[in-house]
């Protein structure tokens, strides 16, 4: 039985607080929509309003930088 926080073995992307970075292996396919991703390897998704793209260096909501005139969500 795979470890509950091992995303590679369980095929489930764990983004909640139930997992710490310990023993958690998530790949690029694991995308979380909040700053609370506890798995190492999870990609926190940065979203800008409308069709605006996020600028380079955006690693999540706290570092989200959108094009001028766009808001981050």
UniProtKB/Swiss-Prot annotation:
The lineage of its organism: Eukaryota, Metazoa, Spiralia, Lophotrochozoa, Mollusca. Cd(2+) 6 binds at residues 54, 66, 70, 72. Cd(2+) 5 binds at residues 48, 52, 54, 58. It comes from the Eukaryota. The keyword Ribosomal protein does not apply. Cd(2+) 1 binds at residues 15, 19, 32, 37. Cd(2+) 2 binds at residues 19, 24, 39, 42. InterPro entries: Metalthion_mollusc. Cd(2+) 4 binds at residues 46, 58, 64, 72. Belongs to the metallothionein superfamily. Type 2 family. This is Metallothionein 10-III. The keyword Metal-binding applies. Disulfide bonds: none annotated. Monomer. GO terms for molecular function: metal ion binding.
